[in-house]
Amino acid sequence: MLAKHHSPQRTLRRVFSTRSRGVVAMEFAILAIPFCVLFLGTMEVGYDFFVQIALTNAVNQAARSVQVGATQFAGSGTAEAAWVSSAVCPALGRLLDCGQLYVSVTDIPSGTGQNYYTYLSANPPSLTAMVSSSNSAATCGAAAMMLLRAFYLSPTFLGMLVPIWSQASPVKPGIRVHVTYASAGFVNEYFTGGAAC
């Protein structure tokens, strides 16, 4: 009489179909990776919204101080850096690092039909240009059109896994960051003092 021969696939299938021990642990292990990525992605989106709101609030407060003439720069980098650390950084809040903030205040040249929108089209926001001349400021006199721009480099949780969510840091090579941008265009109020544009 010939021995009954079972194929290896049939034997493995029978073993796996009868033994269900560890199946739940295996299912959790399979679902853990997408759950962790989804959880970290949700946390990152929430953090990015928080940074955007904090940066927009800080830019609006700083723009108001320039608009009413409360901020007068002496034209030196020290005065501009002191203004950023005394006026813009406290408005960011304590959870954000002021060392990752880059601010620029420029006047929009009047005349030749130029306004806020044509100036932005001709001078798009550039983080690399702002990093090279960080915290530059120009305070013009009354009724001058001004533009305040700010970039904040925030850390990213999933930047290494999903490169589309982040970009290479222009300050620290090899580190991926999420760049948040806020700007405010305004016309200075009529105040005394201030440099002529």
Q: Residue ranges of each PLM-predicted region?
A:
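Short, conserved structural patches
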Residues: 2-6, 61-197
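Alpha-helical assembly-interface signal, strongest on the long, hydrophobic N-terminal helix that forms
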Residues: 1-91
